[in-house]
């Protein structure tokens, strides 16, 4: 009887440990808040990514979410899964994402599905970047549409087959000011919901 009790206790302990690890790694639920969390107008980051201060949970989340884990001097990452009104981003809706100059040498915004992978579509339109912003006329005041189907005109990032999705802003070679004070320096892109399926 004592052996059975020990076995049951061991199994329960292992199960609890596994669930905790998966949760912290972001493989179930939304993940634990670990590391040095930064949040600016719904765009979130972890300032320990790419540093020796990153603990195992942070490193597991980085691996899960496909970030390159460069040092902050090389690149910083901000992710959002909500629009400017706080609603979850969804393939069923159309959004306008807009912004201006970013404090770094180059930047990009990429869309990922609910499993943190690129959506499985063939639209060849999963990101927008500084080069495209400059090519469209004004790199200091840019915008693009996020929708499952492309607009007749303008820049487009496809959410087709993305379900509930998020977007990651990468800023390469960020300025020292951004590294020192991200909350005060980052000019966060606006994510405005224009319409959703079923809207009149």
Predicted regions and their residues:
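A compositional/structural signature for long, glycine/proline-rich flexible linkers
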Residues: 1-200
